[in-house]
Curated annotation (Swiss-Prot):
The lineage of its organism: Eukaryota, Metazoa, Chordata, Craniata, Vertebrata. GO terms for cellular component: cell surface; extracellular region. During somatogenesis, expressed predominantly in unsegmented paraxial presomitic mesoderm and, to a much lesser extent, in newly segmented somites. The gene is wif1. It is found in: Secreted. It comes from Xenopus laevis. PROSITE patterns: EGF_1, EGF_2, EGF_3, WIF. This is Wnt inhibitory factor 1. Glycans are attached at N83, N240.
Amino acid sequence: MSLTGYFAAPLCSIFLFILAHADAGQQEDSLYMWIDAHQARVLIGFEEDILIVAEGKMAPFTHDFRKAQQRMPAIPVNIHAMNFTWQATGQAEYFYEFLSLRSLDKGIMADPTVNMPLLGTVPHKATVIQVGFPCLGNQDGVAAFEVNVIVMNSEGNVILQTPQNAIFFKTCQQAKCTGGCRNGGFCNDRHVCECPDGFYGPHCEKALCMPRCMNGGLCVTPGLCICPPGYYGINCDKVNCTTHCLNGGTCFYPGKCICPSGYEGEQCETSKCQQPCRNGGKCSGKNKCKCSKGYQGDLCSKPVCEPSCGAHGTCIEPNKCQCKEGWNGRYCNKKYGSNLMNALRPTGSRNRQHTPSPKRTEDRQALPESNYIW
């Protein structure tokens, strides 16, 4: 027998006791559990199926658990998990529940693990159950642990269960990971660093930031980015410009501005219009102005009057006309004095021909000449 087989052979006795009789009179005949030949080779050095439960009954073995437990060795360092195979044949339904998977020495080994739900139905297809013994690798030592599981039939009767107060043992040793484990990671017994949440890498040296660090930022701890010069923000997504962007420009890179239409230059300080836009207008393209309300023209130099001042006036400000001589009104559409003469003329003579006297003509010509602005 190999050296591994010499130390591993008694291990079968440990797991032959994981399930013991709960009801000696039970005659269920379609539940099976065994250790397959491949796993047996690892344990005892030769390939042979090891039957644990057959036809709902335990394989012939001692039932004096206390005496047997005294002879149980600790699981060796080189065995990290054990595989069992089970199957429910026929039409019968069986249910299982892991009541406890607990390490009693958590500084040496974490809680045992299984590769299946803790509560479920025994499958009708041969299925492997793997029980793992996760040594932490922090120190040399032997960890005590318990595995408590029951199997019930469809009527809810417990037919198999772990003996009460069953304690098992696993030998662990301090692991060595070349380069060490950082950021709270620990070296397991497979000499691999196991990293805490938020870190990854062979030595747990890399932090995980979500969202990721942008613009060359470095994630130094979960959720914290160190930003390169010129950037800031939770994930370095914001730009810190040393120079201010003018005329509505936007900084997108340290010292670089995205200029709005009509401006150029490092700080968007230069207008693309050769002559500046007037009256509040903005340069919107090469030599093209976008005028503010009330103005028009290439340079926004022409005021707008609505409606227009007509043929007898000039628009000098938005909606403000300057009338020619002899014209008045807001839009210069009224001739000066016409309303006054009609008002003074007698009613009966408005339709008669009338020749003004020389004196009235002189008085009329004596009216002051003025350029009205309305």
